[in-house]
Amino acid sequence: TIAQEEIFGPVLSIIAYEDEDDAAAIANDSVYGLSGGVWSADGERAKAFARRIRTGQIEVNGGAFNASAPFGGYKNSGYGREYGPHGFEEFLEIKSLQL
């Protein structure tokens, strides 16, 4: 299904689900996890649901892209992070001195 592919859009897919647990299971049942979106009239409920989704970034109610926040995916959707302090750390090499 479209939920199993890493597609680039803009694309809107609509998949029926029974309840929030089923919706989270469908969203997380993929080897990819770059980004996603959650919309709800209840902002707190949307944020709680967004935390359950295994993606590197997720928009809540159409939130704008934040270039200061780390960007990158989970699972097979990329390695590491860009932007923000986590992105900066990708360029550091850590050394442990054993004295």
Where do the model's predicted regions map?
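Conserved C-terminal structural/oligomerization subdomain of aldehyde/semialdehyde dehydrogenase
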Residues: 1-99
